[in-house]
Amino acid sequence: MAIDVAKYIAWKLNKRLVSIPTILSVDAFTTPAAGIRNNHDVEYLGEATPDPLIIDYNVLRSAPKELNIAGVGDLFSIHTASFDWEYANSRGKSEYPFKVEAINGGKKILEFIYDNIGNIKANNNNGLRAIVEAYISLNTICLPIDHFRIEEGSEHYLFYELEERLKRPFIHGNIIGLGIYLLSRLQNNDPLFITEMMNESGLIYQPISMNIKKDDLVNSLLNLKKFVKSKDKLWYTIIDDSEIN
C-alpha cells in the first residue's frame, strides 16, 4: 500500500509523515510500523507516526463506498483475535502478559462499531468518522502494550495463507472478513452474531466476490495449521490446536 511505502521512507529518511487517506480499507494510515512483504510474508518495520493525520470526508466519499466499508474488517477482527489471545493465555501460550483491560477495550470498540453500523453502511460522514475513531481507539490500546494481539489472530492467518497460495493481493478488510466468518466458526465464537454484523455493515467478504475458487479455499483451510506452524512469528491461536478436515 502507498501508506506503507510512505511510512517506510519517512522512517528511513527521518522525515515527517503527513497522512491523508483516500480510502479506509485498512488501519495502516493510523499505525506507526510499515507493512513490508518479503516473498509474501508480512514484516512490520520502523516507526513513523502521522503528523498530522488529515481526514477529508469529501476525498473519502469520492472513493467507491465498498473500499471504505472494508475498513471495518480490521475492527470486526477484534472479535476473533481477542478470542485467540484469551485462548492462548488459557493454554499458557500467550507471547505477552495478558491484559484484561485490553480485551475489554476491544469489546468497547466493537460496541461502538455496532452502534454506528447504519452510518458505516451509508458511507456518510458519521460512518467514516466512526471507522477512523475506532482505529485511533485501537491504537491507544495496542501501542502502549507494543502489540496488536486483540486485533490480529487466526482470521489474519487465513489471509496470509491465501495470499501466499494465490500470489495476488486482496482488499484487506474484505479478505479479513472471510477469515472472521470461517474462524469464528472454528472457535465456536458467536459466529452468527458477527456474521450478521458484517452483513449489516455491507462488508463484502464472500469468496466469490474475491474470485476465490472453492478448491483453493478448501485447500487453504486444510493447509492452515501447517502454514501457521511454519511461520515462527505468528502468534498462538485456535488453529494450533485444531484439526481442520
Ranges and model annotations:
Residues 1-18, 119-127:
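N-terminal small/polar loop signature for handling phosphorylated ligands or for N-terminal nucleophile
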Residues 2, 54, 154:
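Generic enzyme active-site microenvironment
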Residues 5-6, 27, 62, 161-162:
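Generic hydrophobic alpha-helical membrane-span motif
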Residues 84, 188-245:
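C-terminal charged capping/lid subdomain of soluble metabolic enzymes
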Residues 89-118, 221-245:
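C-terminal intrinsically disordered extensions
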Residues 99-200, 205:
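Active-site segments that bind and position negatively charged phosphate/pyrophosphate groups
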Residues 74-77, 133, 160, 222:
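Generic alpha-helical structural context detector
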Residues 11-109:
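A glycine/threonine-rich phosphate-anchoring loop and its flanking beta-alpha core
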